[in-house]
Amino acid sequence: MAEITAKLVKELREKSGAGVMDAKKALVETDGDMDKAIELLREKGMAKAAKKADRVAAEGLTGVYVSGNYAAVVEVNAETDFVAKNAQFVELVNDTAKTIAEGKPANNEEALNLIMPSGETLAAAYVNATATIGEKISFRRFSLLEKTDEQHFGAYQHNGGRIGVISVIEGGDDALAKQVSMHIAAMKPTVLSYTELDPQFVKDELAKLNHNIELDNESRAMVDKAPLPFLQYGSKAQLSEDVIAKAEEDIKAELAAEGKPEKIWDKIIPGKMDRFMLDNTKVDQAYTLLAQVYIMDDSKTVEAYLDSVNAKAIAFARFEVGEGIEKKANDFESEVAATMAAALNN
């Protein structure tokens, strides 16, 4: 039987990423054959990964990477926040973003077949990471953005990498693009423009807003405050030419009833129309980047600010770790109970 030296164990660990005991056991089982030991660890790693496949991984990090005129933002998940801070995990996330930006896959299936800097496929890298780290590690999603030579990327990560953003702007510079990405990280828009919102979604969100107004009015009534008006519309998409024309006529009728001289109406109407637009595009303001008040200049929307500096938002992608993942509150408790039960039965 071959002698299993510390040097041999170290070499196997460096090649496989396995722990000391796992590496030593693999060498013992394969009589010191390095290639067979690596293959054995790979098979055991796949088995470990398979056992962890149905676990919920809702922690993790985002990664962003710019490669020429392409940029990628990715989300990689782990089961615990502790592992998400692990150096091996962070390297995996960064390598994944780089691989996506340079490989330009069309979907997750293509992405999983790309070759990582380590020389293995992305899919294999995650199997091995799950085996060596000891938690389910999963590649969840990516977004790949492209720009022209004249456009600019804004790459930004917030909260230790839990939020990752890439934006594309035309005009301006990289610094402005990064500021736009910082706004996106903070304000959570889901689309660029109101034209991308689903009509039924707008109706549903408008109903929620009016329900909140109804609840607020109940509280206001208790302290003899005047009720707030309900919203008629929620998006610019609902404001047809007829709707806007009627709003202007209503304002004129209001001014006439107040006895305001017609000669000053032209000075009053634009401000009231701006207010009408603001009050009736609340859904746009919540979900569309261009309609949101710009955090760097709260006197303007993002669209108005960019227009004032001869720039334009083209596209963006924003990922926040765990969004949309339903994590059971008793995952940890269940795992501990199962471990104790197994120990008692052995």
UniProtKB/Swiss-Prot annotation:
Name of the featured protein: Elongation factor Ts
Pfam families: EF_TS
Region (Involved in Mg(2+) ion dislocation from EF-Tu): 80-83
Domain of life of the native organism: Bacteria
HAMAP family: EF_Ts
Keyword set includes Protein biosynthesis: yes
Function: Associates with the EF-Tu.GDP complex and induces the exchange of GDP to GTP. It remains bound to the aminoacyl-tRNA.EF-Tu.GTP complex up to the GTP hydrolysis stage on the ribosome.
Annotated Gene3D superfamilies: 1.10.286.20, DNA helicase RuvA subunit, C-terminal domain, Elongation factor Ts, dimerisation domain
GO cellular component terms, A-Z: cytoplasm
Coiled-coil portions: none
